[in-house]
Amino acid sequence: PNTSLVTEAGLEIGEMRGIKVNDYLQTSDEHIYAVGDAIEFRHPLTDRPWLNYLAGPANRQARIVADNMVFGNKVTYEGAVGTSIAKIFDMTVAASGLPAKRLKQAGIDYLSATIHSGSHAGYYPDALQMSIKITFSPVNGKLLGAQIVGYNGVDKRIDEFSQVIKHNGTVYDLMALEQAYAPPFSSAKDPVAVAGYVAGNILSGKMKPLYWRELQAADLSKVTLVDVRTPDEFALGALKGAVNIPLDDMRERMKEFPQDKPVYLYCGVGLRGYLASNILLQNGFGEVRNLIGGLKLYKAATAPLPKPKEFSNSGSSSSDSSKVDHSEHSKDSAEAYTIASSVIPSMKAIKVDACGISCPGPIMKLKKSMEELADGERLEIV
């Protein structure tokens, strides 16, 4: 922050190079108060000074200073956990508290959970998935941070996470929150509660998590990697080295799971992998781990980032380090675009709305619609 005037005035600067203030927002000169982006104040979670560039806390600080200047130092400032939100085209991204990167920098132990849940009930029109990641203490489940990427309803969910973090709540408090529910606005199991349930399962030992970085670095010759999705989903793309044993067939195919290796399970978003892990554990298997966030998170996290010059040719890829099999998508994009451009205008479009359908619903609906396509028709899915 620009604190040159403060330095010239002889006021104390903190270790983050912000204006150092006390709980009443007084500077080193008791007659001078300071608020806003240029002050540094201890973070409620780390108890270490930090800079918070947000308008909400700044305005609250101004109210506190006004009260203290008029009535004497009676109101203290408790600090901000840093709740922010931004709109990027049609998407909304939001965060509160400390993400994994900040926790690592601070040397704080943590666990994390990632879910993909609908913005409202799936049977009500226009439900869209949001991805939520929370970080929490492995000791007592204290909620440390939350991040959300989605379309609708991101704002109200991040506000709920923020309140739990601000009041030193735990992932168990997420399960107990009472939200307004009706199908257009939420689900009977709100995404905030679902995040709490997943974190609770990790803490209780009901599910041993497998994080995408661990899977990326794993020696697959020493583990059994199992895709528990349907055969149709598996055929559309799977992780290299995975065998397909659908969740519904597991009990009949139990002998296909080797007992002498750890079993790594994954599905689309994590739910079926969790159910499959319980089946294996109840049948005496030792180390069984479920990929947190499922294939959706793994593909998003390991996809190569395009370079600026590649935006004009999105079909090319400069990296093959991902374990995701992209062989179905390796055709020359320019040729495909030329062919498509010449034939699409004359085709009849069949539109399929798969919004709000939980997996494997969209895949099954797409497959059924493809089977019903007549010659000269094209399929559009949203």
Model regions: which residues?
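Domain-level signature for proteins that mediate thiol-based redox and metal-cofactor handling
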Residues: 326-382
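FAD-site-proximal beta/loop scaffold in flavoenzymes
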Residues: 1-67, 160, 164
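Mid-to-C-terminal Rossmann-like scaffold of FAD/NAD(P)H-dependent oxidoreductases
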Residues: 38-152, 183, 187, 191-217, ...
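Generic hydrophobic alpha-helical segments
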Residues: 161-162, 215, 263, 369
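Short, surface-exposed connector motifs at secondary-structure boundaries
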Residues: 142, 258-262, 372-379
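Short, glycine/acidic-enriched loop or turn micro-motifs at the edges of active sites
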Residues: 40, 230, 249, 356
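Rhodanese-like catalytic fold shared by cysteine-dependent sulfurtransferases
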Residues: 172-183, 187-224, 231-264, 268-346
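A short, polar/charged loop-to-alpha-helix boundary motif
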Residues: 152-170
